[in-house]
């Protein structure tokens, strides 16, 4: 296994001293305000009027940008995806797939670090509301297909669906450690991710065998329900996938 370099503590970018920060577009103001509110209250308790007031926009502007609260989460996730995809490390190209994926997911966690409180809030809401958890899972799978691609791991076809769903569940388990990891270097989170990827290799191999010999059944099983191995993984790593 290649030696992993020490990772710098994640930080929000700061404007130059003495210079006013650039004005955010209305859409970005709303996303930022929504995640600030999530740090204070549950997803289901946030009202449109409170959100518009926190963002400093009118209700008409809020409605123009977003039709409901879930698309705000989706927009945030897309922004995180883009940040991770833009930060690729060419030096990782020759590393094994597991190491490349570890690097990609750690970059994702570093990008998420300023919003730990909001993510913790969303995780709690997903546990209380199965329909919300299901919606989050759809976002998570889409996002993790991009993360697999960033790690140069095939994410196309039925096998890609399997990999993305498995990775979404694995990452949800890691997030449970991440939201309570107070170390700036995310040492506990790195260890949790390392263990999760090790455990996930067995599960991934079992389902990839299914895809190899019966690709139609592979895709349909993801729609109809989980196999016993998937339920075991859920029990070990978390009840739901969170789209981060």
Residue ranges and their predicted role:
Residues 77-84:
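Short, basic, alpha-helical segments at the C-terminal edge of helix-turn-helix-like DNA-binding modules
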Residues 17-30:
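Short, Lys/Arg-enriched anionic-surface-contact patches
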Residues 29, 50, 103, 121, ...:
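Amphipathic alpha-helical interaction segments
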Residues 47, 120-122, 135, 156:
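Short, hydrophobic secondary-structure boundary micro-motifs
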Residues 75, 89-124, 128, 138:
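Hydrophobic alpha-helical connector segments
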Residues 130-153, 161-175, 191, 199:
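Amphipathic alpha-helical packing segments from all-alpha helical-bundle domains
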Residues 2-13, 180-244:
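C-terminal peripheral helix-coil segments that are non-catalytic and often amphipathic
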Residues 2, 29, 37-75:
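Helix-turn-helix
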């Amino acid at each position: 296994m290649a030696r992993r370099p020490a990772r710098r503590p994640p930080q929000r970018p700061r404007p130059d001293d003495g210079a006013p920060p650039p004005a955010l577009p209305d859409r970005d103001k709303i996303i930022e305000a929504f995640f600030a509110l999530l740090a204070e209250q549950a997803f289901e308790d946030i009202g449109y009027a409170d959100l518009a007031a926190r963002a400093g926009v009118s209700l008409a502007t809020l409605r123009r940008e977003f039709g409901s609260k879930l698309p705000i989460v989706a927009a945030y996730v897309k922004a995180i995806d883009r940040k991770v995809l833009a930060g690729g490390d060419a030096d990782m190209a020759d590393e094994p797939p597991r190491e490349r994926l570890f690097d990609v997911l750690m970059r994702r966690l570093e990008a998420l670090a300023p919003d730990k409180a909001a993510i913790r809030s969303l995780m709690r809401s997903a546990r209380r509301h199965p329909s919300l958890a299901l919606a989050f899972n759809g976002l998570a799978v889409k996002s993790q297909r991009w993360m697999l691609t960033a790690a140069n791991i095939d994410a196309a076809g039925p096998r890609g669906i399997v990999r993305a769903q498995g990775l979404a569940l694995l990452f949800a388990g890691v997030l449970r450690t991440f939201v309570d990891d107070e170390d700036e270097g995310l040492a506990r989170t790195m260890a949790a991710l390392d263990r999760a990827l090790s455990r996930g290799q067995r599960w991934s191999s079992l389902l990839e065998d299914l895809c190899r010999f019966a690709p139609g059944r592979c895709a349909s099983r993801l729609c109809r329900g989980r196999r016993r191995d998937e339920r075991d993984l859920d029990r070990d790593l978390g009840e739901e996938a969170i789209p981060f």
